[in-house]
Amino acid sequence: METEFGLTEYASEHTITPVPCLLKEMYSDFIVQEILADHTVLAIPSPDVVLESTGSKKEDIEIEECVAKPDCISEETLAALNDRFSTKGDPVLVKVDDLSKEDRKSIHHFIRERYAGVLITETKEDGILVSHGHTKSSRKRKLWDEKVPKECHFTICKENKETSFACQLIAKFLNVGPNNIRTHGIKDKRAVTSQRVSVTKVHERTILDLNSKLRGIRVFGCEYKDDPVQMGAHWGNRFSIVLRSLPDDSEQLLHQRLETFQNTGFINYFGTQRFGSRSSTTAEIGLAIVKRDWEKAVKMIMTNAMPDHLGYGSVGYAAKCFSQTGDARKAFSKLKGAQAFATVEGNILKCLSKGGTWQNCITEAIPIQSRSLYVHAYQSLIWNKVASRRVKEYGTRVHESDVGANGFSLGEHATHYDIHIPLPGENLPFEGSYGAKWISELLEEDGLTQSSFTALKDRFSLGESSRCLFVEAKELKWKFIRYGNARDLLQDGLQTRAIPEAEQKGPLLALQIQFSLISGSYATVALREVTGSDMGKKAMRDASFKTRGDDEKTEENVLEEKGSDDANELNLVSEDQ
Protein backbone atom coordinates (compact mmCIF):
# COMPACT_ATOMS: atom_id res chain seq x y z
CA MET A 1 0.00 0.00 0.00
CA GLU A 2 2.88 2.37 0.78
CA THR A 3 4.35 2.26 -2.70
CA GLU A 4 1.12 3.32 -4.41
CA PHE A 5 1.26 6.52 -2.36
CA GLY A 6 4.91 7.23 -3.16
CA LEU A 7 6.61 5.91 -0.01
CA THR A 8 9.44 3.93 -1.59
CA GLU A 9 12.74 5.19 -0.06
CA TYR A 10 14.47 5.31 3.34
CA ALA A 11 16.84 7.80 4.98
CA SER A 12 19.15 4.99 6.07
CA GLU A 13 21.92 4.13 3.63
CA HIS A 14 21.72 0.48 4.70
CA THR A 15 19.26 -2.07 3.38
CA ILE A 16 16.35 -2.33 5.81
CA THR A 17 14.71 -5.71 6.22
CA PRO A 18 11.18 -5.63 7.70
CA VAL A 19 10.67 -6.42 11.38
CA PRO A 20 7.08 -7.64 11.90
CA CYS A 21 5.10 -5.88 14.61
CA LEU A 22 1.61 -4.72 15.56
CA LEU A 23 0.68 -1.02 15.85
CA LYS A 24 -2.45 0.43 17.51
CA GLU A 25 -3.51 -2.98 18.77
CA MET A 26 -5.09 -1.19 21.74
CA TYR A 27 -6.22 2.45 21.67
CA SER A 28 -3.73 3.35 24.42
CA ASP A 29 -0.86 1.95 22.33
CA PHE A 30 -0.82 5.23 20.40
CA ILE A 31 -0.77 8.42 22.47
CA VAL A 32 -0.54 11.87 20.86
CA GLN A 33 -0.02 14.98 22.99
CA GLU A 34 -0.06 18.32 21.20
CA ILE A 35 2.95 20.56 21.78
CA LEU A 36 2.05 24.26 21.78
CA ALA A 37 4.14 27.04 20.27
CA ASP A 38 5.75 27.69 23.68
CA HIS A 39 6.69 23.96 23.80
CA THR A 40 4.09 23.12 26.46
CA VAL A 41 3.10 19.46 26.11
CA LEU A 42 -0.63 19.02 26.71
CA ALA A 43 -1.28 16.43 29.38
CA ILE A 44 -3.67 13.50 29.29
CA PRO A 45 -5.01 13.62 32.87
CA SER A 46 -6.58 10.81 34.83
CA PRO A 47 -10.39 10.50 34.76
CA ASP A 48 -10.51 11.75 38.37
CA VAL A 49 -8.77 15.01 37.48
CA VAL A 50 -11.14 15.64 34.59
CA LEU A 51 -14.26 14.83 36.60
CA GLU A 52 -13.18 17.08 39.48
CA SER A 53 -13.08 20.02 37.08
CA THR A 54 -16.47 19.23 35.57
CA GLY A 55 -18.73 22.12 36.32
CA SER A 56 -17.02 22.70 39.66
CA LYS A 57 -14.99 25.75 38.73
CA LYS A 58 -17.26 28.78 38.60
CA GLU A 59 -16.83 31.73 36.32
CA ASP A 60 -14.84 34.57 37.78
CA ILE A 61 -17.75 36.92 37.09
CA GLU A 62 -19.18 39.24 39.73
CA ILE A 63 -21.88 41.88 39.82
CA GLU A 64 -20.58 45.24 38.60
CA GLU A 65 -21.80 47.44 41.47
CA CYS A 66 -20.45 50.57 39.82
CA VAL A 67 -23.00 50.48 36.98
CA ALA A 68 -25.57 53.22 37.62
CA LYS A 69 -29.13 52.01 38.22
CA PRO A 70 -31.80 53.68 36.08
CA ASP A 71 -34.53 55.40 38.09
CA CYS A 72 -37.14 53.21 36.36
CA ILE A 73 -35.83 50.07 38.14
CA SER A 74 -37.14 49.72 41.70
CA GLU A 75 -35.13 48.40 44.64
CA GLU A 76 -37.47 45.40 44.77
CA THR A 77 -36.76 44.59 41.10
CA LEU A 78 -33.02 45.07 41.69
CA ALA A 79 -33.10 42.57 44.57
CA ALA A 80 -34.90 40.04 42.36
CA LEU A 81 -32.30 40.49 39.63
CA ASN A 82 -29.43 40.03 42.11
CA ASP A 83 -31.06 36.85 43.36
CA ARG A 84 -31.49 35.57 39.82
CA PHE A 85 -27.81 36.25 39.09
CA SER A 86 -26.76 34.11 42.06
CA THR A 87 -29.10 31.19 41.46
CA LYS A 88 -30.99 29.86 38.47
CA GLY A 89 -34.77 29.95 38.71
CA ASP A 90 -37.88 31.43 37.14
CA PRO A 91 -37.29 34.51 34.95
CA VAL A 92 -37.86 37.97 36.39
CA LEU A 93 -40.39 40.19 34.59
CA VAL A 94 -39.52 43.89 34.63
CA LYS A 95 -42.65 45.97 34.04
CA VAL A 96 -42.21 48.71 31.44
CA ASP A 97 -45.70 50.22 31.36
CA ASP A 98 -45.61 53.89 30.32
CA LEU A 99 -41.81 53.84 29.94
CA SER A 100 -40.19 55.59 27.00
CA LYS A 101 -38.04 53.83 24.42
CA GLU A 102 -34.93 55.34 26.01
CA ASP A 103 -35.96 54.05 29.46
CA ARG A 104 -36.49 50.53 28.11
CA LYS A 105 -33.15 50.71 26.33
CA SER A 106 -31.45 51.79 29.56
CA ILE A 107 -32.89 48.72 31.34
CA HIS A 108 -31.42 46.36 28.74
CA HIS A 109 -28.06 48.15 28.96
CA PHE A 110 -28.03 48.17 32.77
CA ILE A 111 -28.73 44.44 33.06
CA ARG A 112 -26.15 43.56 30.42
CA GLU A 113 -23.40 45.65 32.06
CA ARG A 114 -24.20 44.99 35.74
CA TYR A 115 -24.50 41.21 35.32
CA ALA A 116 -21.72 40.77 32.71
CA GLY A 117 -23.96 39.05 30.17
CA VAL A 118 -24.94 36.26 32.59
CA LEU A 119 -28.52 37.55 32.72
CA ILE A 120 -30.31 37.76 29.37
CA THR A 121 -33.10 40.21 28.52
CA GLU A 122 -35.97 39.62 26.11
CA THR A 123 -38.68 42.09 25.15
CA LYS A 124 -42.18 40.69 25.74
CA GLU A 125 -45.65 42.22 25.39
CA ASP A 126 -46.02 42.64 29.16
CA GLY A 127 -42.44 43.74 29.91
CA ILE A 128 -38.78 42.75 29.78
CA LEU A 129 -38.14 39.12 30.70
CA VAL A 130 -34.80 38.52 32.45
CA SER A 131 -33.42 34.99 32.68
CA HIS A 132 -30.21 33.23 33.70
CA GLY A 133 -28.55 32.13 30.45
CA HIS A 134 -30.14 31.71 27.04
CA THR A 135 -33.76 30.73 26.61
CA LYS A 136 -34.84 28.92 23.44
CA SER A 137 -35.95 32.16 21.84
CA SER A 138 -32.83 34.11 22.82
CA ARG A 139 -30.13 31.48 22.33
CA LYS A 140 -29.03 32.96 18.99
CA ARG A 141 -28.32 36.36 20.58
CA LYS A 142 -25.10 36.01 22.49
CA LEU A 143 -24.47 38.89 24.86
CA TRP A 144 -20.91 38.95 26.10
CA ASP A 145 -19.06 40.98 28.69
CA GLU A 146 -16.67 43.00 26.54
CA LYS A 147 -14.13 43.02 29.38
CA VAL A 148 -13.74 39.23 29.00
CA PRO A 149 -11.71 37.99 25.97
CA LYS A 150 -14.18 36.41 23.55
CA GLU A 151 -12.26 33.20 22.76
CA CYS A 152 -12.37 30.37 25.27
CA HIS A 153 -9.43 28.00 24.74
CA PHE A 154 -9.65 24.52 26.22
CA THR A 155 -8.11 21.07 25.87
CA ILE A 156 -9.93 18.12 24.30
CA CYS A 157 -8.74 14.68 25.28
CA LYS A 158 -10.33 11.90 23.22
CA GLU A 159 -10.08 8.16 22.65
CA ASN A 160 -11.07 6.42 19.40
CA LYS A 161 -12.71 9.55 18.00
CA GLU A 162 -12.06 11.63 14.90
CA THR A 163 -11.14 15.23 15.75
CA SER A 164 -13.75 16.43 13.25
CA PHE A 165 -16.46 14.32 14.86
CA ALA A 166 -15.52 15.43 18.39
CA CYS A 167 -15.55 19.11 17.37
CA GLN A 168 -18.88 18.87 15.56
CA LEU A 169 -20.42 17.06 18.53
CA ILE A 170 -19.17 19.73 20.92
CA ALA A 171 -20.44 22.46 18.57
CA LYS A 172 -23.87 20.82 18.59
CA PHE A 173 -24.02 20.71 22.38
CA LEU A 174 -22.80 24.33 22.63
CA ASN A 175 -25.31 25.47 20.00
CA VAL A 176 -22.63 27.01 17.77
CA GLY A 177 -21.69 26.37 14.15
CA PRO A 178 -18.99 23.73 13.55
CA ASN A 179 -16.73 26.35 11.94
CA ASN A 180 -16.79 28.19 15.28
CA ILE A 181 -14.65 25.42 16.78
CA ARG A 182 -10.98 25.96 15.91
CA THR A 183 -8.07 23.52 16.26
CA HIS A 184 -4.38 23.43 15.38
CA GLY A 185 -4.94 20.32 13.31
CA ILE A 186 -6.47 16.87 13.16
CA LYS A 187 -5.28 14.06 15.41
CA ASP A 188 -5.45 10.29 14.93
CA LYS A 189 -8.72 8.48 15.55
CA ARG A 190 -7.56 5.08 16.82
CA ALA A 191 -5.52 6.61 19.63
CA VAL A 192 -5.61 8.61 22.84
CA THR A 193 -4.96 12.26 21.97
CA SER A 194 -4.92 15.72 23.53
CA GLN A 195 -5.16 19.01 21.65
CA ARG A 196 -6.02 22.66 22.18
CA VAL A 197 -9.34 23.99 20.86
CA SER A 198 -11.13 27.34 20.94
CA VAL A 199 -14.74 28.49 20.68
CA THR A 200 -16.11 32.02 20.46
CA LYS A 201 -18.22 33.57 23.24
CA VAL A 202 -18.93 30.47 25.28
CA HIS A 203 -18.41 30.45 29.05
CA GLU A 204 -15.98 28.08 30.75
CA ARG A 205 -18.72 26.58 32.92
CA THR A 206 -20.78 25.69 29.85
CA ILE A 207 -17.82 23.89 28.30
CA LEU A 208 -16.93 21.94 31.45
CA ASP A 209 -20.54 20.83 31.85
CA LEU A 210 -20.16 18.88 28.59
CA ASN A 211 -18.20 16.20 30.44
CA SER A 212 -21.47 14.76 31.73
CA LYS A 213 -22.72 14.32 28.14
CA LEU A 214 -19.64 13.17 26.24
CA ARG A 215 -18.36 9.60 25.91
CA GLY A 216 -14.73 8.95 25.12
CA ILE A 217 -14.08 12.72 25.17
CA ARG A 218 -13.00 14.98 28.04
CA VAL A 219 -12.72 18.77 28.07
CA PHE A 220 -10.75 20.81 30.60
CA GLY A 221 -8.18 23.57 31.08
CA CYS A 222 -10.26 26.56 29.97
CA GLU A 223 -8.62 29.95 29.42
CA TYR A 224 -10.01 33.14 27.86
CA LYS A 225 -7.94 34.73 25.08
CA ASP A 226 -8.39 37.43 22.46
CA ASP A 227 -7.65 35.27 19.39
CA PRO A 228 -8.84 31.81 18.34
CA VAL A 229 -6.61 28.77 17.95
CA GLN A 230 -4.95 28.90 14.52
CA MET A 231 -4.42 25.94 12.19
CA GLY A 232 -0.79 24.80 12.30
CA ALA A 233 0.23 27.38 14.92
CA HIS A 234 1.45 24.74 17.39
CA TRP A 235 5.02 23.40 17.47
CA GLY A 236 4.16 19.75 16.92
CA ASN A 237 3.23 16.57 18.79
CA ARG A 238 4.67 14.28 21.44
CA PHE A 239 4.15 10.59 20.66
CA SER A 240 4.24 7.60 22.99
CA ILE A 241 3.79 4.42 20.96
CA VAL A 242 3.82 0.70 21.68
CA LEU A 243 4.81 -1.80 18.99
CA ARG A 244 3.65 -5.30 19.98
CA SER A 245 4.36 -8.90 19.03
CA LEU A 246 8.00 -8.31 18.07
CA PRO A 247 10.17 -11.34 17.23
CA ASP A 248 12.17 -12.54 20.25
CA ASP A 249 15.48 -12.02 18.44
CA SER A 250 14.72 -8.45 17.23
CA GLU A 251 15.75 -6.48 20.32
CA GLN A 252 19.40 -5.94 19.37
CA LEU A 253 18.58 -5.14 15.73
CA LEU A 254 15.93 -2.58 16.69
CA HIS A 255 18.27 -1.02 19.25
CA GLN A 256 20.89 -0.49 16.52
CA ARG A 257 18.31 0.96 14.13
CA LEU A 258 17.03 3.36 16.77
CA GLU A 259 20.56 4.68 17.33
CA THR A 260 20.91 5.25 13.57
CA PHE A 261 17.42 6.79 13.43
CA GLN A 262 18.45 9.21 16.18
CA ASN A 263 21.19 10.59 13.92
CA THR A 264 19.66 10.43 10.43
CA GLY A 265 15.97 11.11 11.04
CA PHE A 266 13.53 10.03 8.34
CA ILE A 267 12.04 11.10 5.02
CA ASN A 268 9.15 13.43 5.79
CA TYR A 269 6.57 11.55 3.73
CA PHE A 270 2.85 12.09 4.18
CA GLY A 271 1.64 8.87 5.82
CA THR A 272 -0.71 6.40 4.17
CA GLN A 273 -3.50 7.32 6.60
CA ARG A 274 -3.71 10.65 4.78
CA PHE A 275 -5.10 8.80 1.77
CA GLY A 276 -7.59 6.49 3.48
CA SER A 277 -8.26 2.84 2.77
CA ARG A 278 -11.60 3.01 0.95
CA SER A 279 -12.44 2.24 -2.67
CA SER A 280 -11.74 5.86 -3.63
CA THR A 281 -8.73 7.39 -1.91
CA THR A 282 -8.90 10.90 -0.51
CA ALA A 283 -6.29 11.88 -3.12
CA GLU A 284 -8.64 10.74 -5.91
CA ILE A 285 -11.45 12.78 -4.36
CA GLY A 286 -9.07 15.72 -4.09
CA LEU A 287 -8.15 15.39 -7.77
CA ALA A 288 -11.85 15.55 -8.68
CA ILE A 289 -12.22 18.71 -6.57
CA VAL A 290 -9.19 20.41 -8.16
CA LYS A 291 -10.72 19.57 -11.56
CA ARG A 292 -14.02 21.09 -10.31
CA ASP A 293 -15.83 17.79 -10.95
CA TRP A 294 -18.05 18.34 -7.92
CA GLU A 295 -20.56 15.59 -8.67
CA LYS A 296 -17.84 12.96 -9.01
CA ALA A 297 -16.24 14.08 -5.74
CA VAL A 298 -19.53 13.87 -3.83
CA LYS A 299 -20.41 10.46 -5.22
CA MET A 300 -16.98 9.08 -4.36
CA ILE A 301 -17.37 10.29 -0.78
CA MET A 302 -20.78 8.66 -0.50
CA THR A 303 -19.60 5.41 -2.11
CA ASN A 304 -16.74 5.23 0.39
CA ALA A 305 -19.29 5.14 3.22
CA MET A 306 -21.11 2.07 1.92
CA PRO A 307 -18.66 -0.67 3.01
CA ASP A 308 -19.26 0.36 6.62
CA HIS A 309 -21.52 -1.50 9.01
CA LEU A 310 -24.94 -1.23 7.32
CA GLY A 311 -27.08 -1.30 10.47
CA TYR A 312 -30.14 0.94 10.50
CA GLY A 313 -29.20 4.52 11.31
CA SER A 314 -25.59 4.15 10.21
CA VAL A 315 -23.82 6.26 7.59
CA GLY A 316 -23.39 3.18 5.40
CA TYR A 317 -27.12 2.43 5.51
CA ALA A 318 -28.01 5.99 4.47
CA ALA A 319 -25.33 6.03 1.74
CA LYS A 320 -26.69 2.79 0.30
CA CYS A 321 -30.21 4.26 0.30
CA PHE A 322 -28.94 7.34 -1.56
CA SER A 323 -27.05 5.20 -4.07
CA GLN A 324 -30.13 3.09 -4.83
CA THR A 325 -32.78 5.83 -4.87
CA GLY A 326 -30.96 9.11 -5.53
CA ASP A 327 -33.31 10.58 -2.90
CA ALA A 328 -31.16 12.63 -0.52
CA ARG A 329 -34.10 13.56 1.73
CA LYS A 330 -35.06 9.92 2.20
CA ALA A 331 -31.44 8.89 2.79
CA PHE A 332 -30.92 11.68 5.33
CA SER A 333 -33.97 10.50 7.28
CA LYS A 334 -32.23 7.14 7.80
CA LEU A 335 -29.50 8.69 9.93
CA LYS A 336 -29.85 8.82 13.68
CA GLY A 337 -28.24 10.89 16.41
CA ALA A 338 -24.85 12.43 15.75
CA GLN A 339 -24.61 10.67 12.37
CA ALA A 340 -26.95 13.32 10.96
CA PHE A 341 -24.90 16.37 11.93
CA ALA A 342 -21.36 15.23 12.80
CA THR A 343 -20.41 13.26 9.68
CA VAL A 344 -19.33 14.37 6.23
CA GLU A 345 -21.98 12.15 4.63
CA GLY A 346 -24.71 13.56 6.88
CA ASN A 347 -23.72 17.11 5.93
CA ILE A 348 -23.83 16.20 2.23
CA LEU A 349 -27.25 14.54 2.42
CA LYS A 350 -28.66 17.46 4.39
CA CYS A 351 -27.33 19.91 1.79
CA LEU A 352 -28.78 17.95 -1.14
CA SER A 353 -32.12 17.47 0.61
CA LYS A 354 -32.42 21.26 0.90
CA GLY A 355 -31.77 21.81 -2.81
CA GLY A 356 -28.03 22.41 -2.64
CA THR A 357 -25.78 21.78 -5.64
CA TRP A 358 -22.94 19.29 -5.88
CA GLN A 359 -20.54 22.20 -5.44
CA ASN A 360 -22.42 23.45 -2.36
CA CYS A 361 -21.92 20.03 -0.80
CA ILE A 362 -18.15 20.32 -1.07
CA THR A 363 -17.49 24.04 -0.59
CA GLU A 364 -20.15 24.86 2.01
CA ALA A 365 -21.77 21.84 3.67
CA ILE A 366 -18.53 20.13 4.71
CA PRO A 367 -16.61 22.12 7.38
CA ILE A 368 -13.43 23.66 6.02
CA GLN A 369 -11.07 21.56 8.16
CA SER A 370 -12.67 18.41 6.73
CA ARG A 371 -13.03 19.40 3.07
CA SER A 372 -9.47 20.71 2.97
CA LEU A 373 -8.16 17.21 3.66
CA TYR A 374 -9.18 16.00 0.22
CA VAL A 375 -7.22 18.64 -1.72
CA HIS A 376 -4.33 18.33 0.75
CA ALA A 377 -4.31 14.57 0.12
CA TYR A 378 -3.85 15.06 -3.62
CA GLN A 379 -1.06 17.58 -3.01
CA SER A 380 0.50 15.10 -0.58
CA LEU A 381 0.51 12.29 -3.13
CA ILE A 382 2.35 14.47 -5.64
CA TRP A 383 4.83 15.62 -2.97
CA ASN A 384 5.57 12.04 -1.89
CA LYS A 385 6.39 11.02 -5.46
CA VAL A 386 8.71 13.99 -5.92
CA ALA A 387 10.41 13.32 -2.57
CA SER A 388 11.08 9.71 -3.54
CA ARG A 389 12.54 10.77 -6.88
CA ARG A 390 14.82 13.27 -5.11
CA VAL A 391 16.20 10.63 -2.71
CA LYS A 392 16.51 8.03 -5.45
CA GLU A 393 18.46 10.35 -7.78
CA TYR A 394 20.55 12.39 -5.32
CA GLY A 395 20.71 10.28 -2.14
CA THR A 396 20.31 11.58 1.42
CA ARG A 397 23.10 14.16 1.47
CA VAL A 398 22.77 17.80 0.41
CA HIS A 399 23.03 18.20 -3.38
CA GLU A 400 24.02 21.36 -5.25
CA SER A 401 20.54 21.66 -6.77
CA ASP A 402 18.74 21.52 -3.40
CA VAL A 403 16.95 24.58 -2.02
CA GLY A 404 15.81 25.67 1.44
CA ALA A 405 12.50 26.89 2.86
CA ASN A 406 12.84 30.24 1.06
CA GLY A 407 13.55 28.62 -2.31
CA PHE A 408 17.21 29.76 -2.28
CA SER A 409 20.21 27.49 -2.74
CA LEU A 410 21.60 26.00 0.46
CA GLY A 411 24.82 27.25 2.02
CA GLU A 412 27.93 25.20 2.68
CA HIS A 413 26.95 24.50 6.30
CA ALA A 414 23.46 23.23 5.46
CA THR A 415 22.41 19.73 6.50
CA HIS A 416 19.92 17.34 4.95
CA TYR A 417 17.32 18.68 7.41
CA ASP A 418 17.43 22.04 5.55
CA ILE A 419 16.29 20.62 2.19
CA HIS A 420 12.77 21.69 1.16
CA ILE A 421 10.49 20.56 -1.64
CA PRO A 422 7.52 22.72 -2.71
CA LEU A 423 3.91 21.60 -2.60
CA PRO A 424 1.76 21.73 -5.75
CA GLY A 425 0.45 25.22 -6.51
CA GLU A 426 1.81 28.54 -7.76
CA ASN A 427 4.97 29.08 -5.73
CA LEU A 428 7.23 31.86 -6.99
CA PRO A 429 10.23 31.24 -4.67
CA PHE A 430 10.57 27.68 -5.99
CA GLU A 431 10.17 28.38 -9.71
CA GLY A 432 13.01 26.78 -11.62
CA SER A 433 13.82 24.22 -8.93
CA TYR A 434 13.79 20.51 -9.70
CA GLY A 435 10.87 20.17 -7.28
CA ALA A 436 8.66 22.59 -9.20
CA LYS A 437 9.64 20.98 -12.50
CA TRP A 438 8.87 17.43 -11.37
CA ILE A 439 5.57 18.53 -9.81
CA SER A 440 4.49 20.16 -13.09
CA GLU A 441 5.25 16.93 -14.95
CA LEU A 442 3.05 14.90 -12.58
CA LEU A 443 0.23 17.48 -12.68
CA GLU A 444 0.29 17.45 -16.47
CA GLU A 445 -0.38 13.70 -16.40
CA ASP A 446 -3.60 14.50 -14.50
CA GLY A 447 -4.59 17.36 -16.81
CA LEU A 448 -3.67 20.09 -14.33
CA THR A 449 -1.18 22.93 -13.90
CA GLN A 450 0.29 24.66 -10.86
CA SER A 451 -2.30 27.44 -11.27
CA SER A 452 -5.17 24.95 -10.89
CA PHE A 453 -4.86 25.37 -7.11
CA THR A 454 -4.88 29.18 -6.95
CA ALA A 455 -8.65 29.72 -6.81
CA LEU A 456 -9.01 27.03 -4.12
CA LYS A 457 -6.67 28.64 -1.58
CA ASP A 458 -9.26 30.33 0.62
CA ARG A 459 -11.98 27.68 0.59
CA PHE A 460 -9.55 24.83 1.17
CA SER A 461 -6.86 26.36 3.43
CA LEU A 462 -4.01 25.87 0.98
CA GLY A 463 -1.43 27.85 2.91
CA GLU A 464 1.74 25.77 3.18
CA SER A 465 4.18 26.37 0.31
CA SER A 466 6.93 23.83 0.98
CA ARG A 467 7.88 20.91 3.21
CA CYS A 468 11.22 19.78 4.59
CA LEU A 469 12.46 16.57 3.00
CA PHE A 470 13.96 15.08 6.18
CA VAL A 471 12.81 15.38 9.81
CA GLU A 472 14.54 14.73 13.11
CA ALA A 473 12.69 12.89 15.88
CA LYS A 474 13.48 14.95 18.98
CA GLU A 475 13.70 13.79 22.62
CA LEU A 476 13.80 10.17 21.49
CA LYS A 477 13.42 7.51 24.19
CA TRP A 478 12.72 3.80 23.99
CA LYS A 479 12.48 0.70 26.11
CA PHE A 480 11.54 -2.93 25.56
CA ILE A 481 8.67 -4.44 27.57
CA ARG A 482 7.82 -8.05 28.26
CA TYR A 483 4.16 -8.98 28.73
CA GLY A 484 2.16 -12.16 29.06
CA ASN A 485 -1.25 -11.50 27.51
CA ALA A 486 -1.92 -10.10 24.03
CA ARG A 487 -4.39 -7.61 25.51
CA ASP A 488 -2.30 -6.41 28.44
CA LEU A 489 -2.42 -2.60 28.59
CA LEU A 490 1.13 -1.25 28.39
CA GLN A 491 0.34 2.50 28.60
CA ASP A 492 -2.24 4.53 30.50
CA GLY A 493 -5.29 5.53 28.45
CA LEU A 494 -8.09 8.02 28.90
CA GLN A 495 -10.01 5.73 31.27
CA THR A 496 -7.64 2.77 31.65
CA ARG A 497 -4.37 2.06 33.41
CA ALA A 498 -1.34 0.08 32.28
CA ILE A 499 -0.34 -3.10 34.07
CA PRO A 500 2.17 -2.45 36.90
CA GLU A 501 5.88 -2.82 36.13
CA ALA A 502 6.00 -5.86 38.39
CA GLU A 503 3.63 -7.62 36.00
CA GLN A 504 5.57 -6.65 32.87
CA LYS A 505 6.96 -10.08 32.17
CA GLY A 506 6.11 -12.98 29.93
CA PRO A 507 6.84 -14.49 26.52
CA LEU A 508 5.68 -11.51 24.41
CA LEU A 509 7.96 -8.61 23.44
CA ALA A 510 6.97 -4.98 22.82
CA LEU A 511 8.84 -1.74 22.13
CA GLN A 512 7.71 1.52 23.71
CA ILE A 513 9.09 4.45 21.71
CA GLN A 514 8.63 8.14 22.54
CA PHE A 515 9.58 11.17 20.44
CA SER A 516 8.48 14.65 19.41
CA LEU A 517 7.82 15.72 15.81
CA ILE A 518 7.20 19.11 14.26
CA SER A 519 3.64 19.77 13.09
CA GLY A 520 2.62 18.02 9.91
CA SER A 521 5.01 15.07 10.31
CA TYR A 522 3.74 11.52 10.68
CA ALA A 523 4.71 9.18 13.50
CA THR A 524 3.87 6.14 11.37
CA VAL A 525 6.39 7.31 8.76
CA ALA A 526 9.02 7.71 11.48
CA LEU A 527 8.29 4.17 12.73
CA ARG A 528 8.65 2.86 9.18
CA GLU A 529 12.30 3.93 9.26
CA VAL A 530 12.84 1.77 12.36
CA THR A 531 10.80 -1.33 11.49
CA GLY A 532 11.17 -1.36 7.70
CA SER A 533 7.50 -2.35 7.59
CA ASP A 534 4.38 -0.77 6.14
CA MET A 535 2.88 0.93 9.21
CA GLY A 536 -0.37 1.94 7.50
CA LYS A 537 -3.80 1.06 8.87
CA LYS A 538 -4.60 -1.70 6.38
CA ALA A 539 -1.20 -3.38 6.70
CA MET A 540 -1.35 -3.33 10.50
CA ARG A 541 -4.92 -4.62 10.58
CA ASP A 542 -3.99 -7.50 8.27
CA ALA A 543 -0.93 -8.26 10.41
CA SER A 544 -3.07 -8.23 13.56
CA PHE A 545 -5.55 -10.73 12.18
CA LYS A 546 -2.77 -12.91 10.81
CA THR A 547 -0.92 -12.96 14.13
CA ARG A 548 -3.89 -14.00 16.26
CA GLY A 549 -6.28 -15.42 13.68
CA ASP A 550 -9.76 -14.16 12.79
CA ASP A 551 -11.28 -15.95 15.79
CA GLU A 552 -9.13 -14.01 18.22
CA LYS A 553 -9.81 -10.43 17.14
CA THR A 554 -9.76 -8.03 20.07
CA GLU A 555 -12.94 -6.28 21.06
CA GLU A 556 -11.44 -3.01 19.86
CA ASN A 557 -10.71 -4.40 16.39
CA VAL A 558 -14.22 -5.85 16.13
CA LEU A 559 -15.73 -2.47 16.98
CA GLU A 560 -13.39 -0.78 14.51
CA GLU A 561 -14.42 -3.17 11.75
CA LYS A 562 -18.17 -3.06 12.37
CA GLY A 563 -18.48 0.55 13.41
CA SER A 564 -20.33 1.66 16.51
CA ASP A 565 -22.71 4.40 17.53
CA ASP A 566 -20.14 5.62 20.03
CA ALA A 567 -17.35 5.93 17.48
CA ASN A 568 -19.30 7.46 14.57
CA GLU A 569 -16.28 7.53 12.26
CA LEU A 570 -16.19 10.38 9.75
CA ASN A 571 -14.53 8.23 7.07
CA LEU A 572 -11.78 10.81 6.69
CA VAL A 573 -8.07 10.28 7.09
CA SER A 574 -6.39 11.48 10.24
CA GLU A 575 -3.26 13.57 10.30
CA ASP A 576 -0.53 13.81 12.91
CA GLN A 577 -0.63 17.59 12.59
UniProtKB/Swiss-Prot annotation:
Q: Name one GO biological process term.
A: pseudouridine synthesis
Query: What's a single GO CC term here?
Result: nucleus
Which region ranges are annotated with the description Disordered? Answer: 538-577
The record's section on InterPro entries has: PsdUridine_synth_cat_dom_sf (IPR020103), PsdUridine_synth_TruD (IPR001656), PsdUridine_synth_TruD_CS (IPR020119), PsdUridine_synth_TruD_insert (IPR011760), TruD_catalytic (IPR042214)
User: Which reaction does this enzyme catalyse, per its entry?
Assistant: a uridine in tRNA = a pseudouridine in tRNA
Q: Name one GO molecular function term.
A: pseudouridine synthase activity
Entry EC number(s): 5.4.99.-
Specify the domain of life of the species encoding this protein: Eukaryota
Catalytic center residues: D188
Start and end residues of each TRUD domain: 265-472
Give the UniProt keywords, A-Z: Isomerase, tRNA processing
Give the Basic and acidic residues compositional bias ranges. Answer: 538-565
User: In the UniProt record, does the keyword tRNA processing occur?
Assistant: yes
Q: Which family does it belong to?
A: Belongs to the pseudouridine synthase TruD family.
Protein known as? Putative pseudouridine synthase B0024.11
Record organism:
Caenorhabditis elegans
Organism ancestry: Eukaryota, Metazoa, Ecdysozoa, Nematoda, Chromadorea
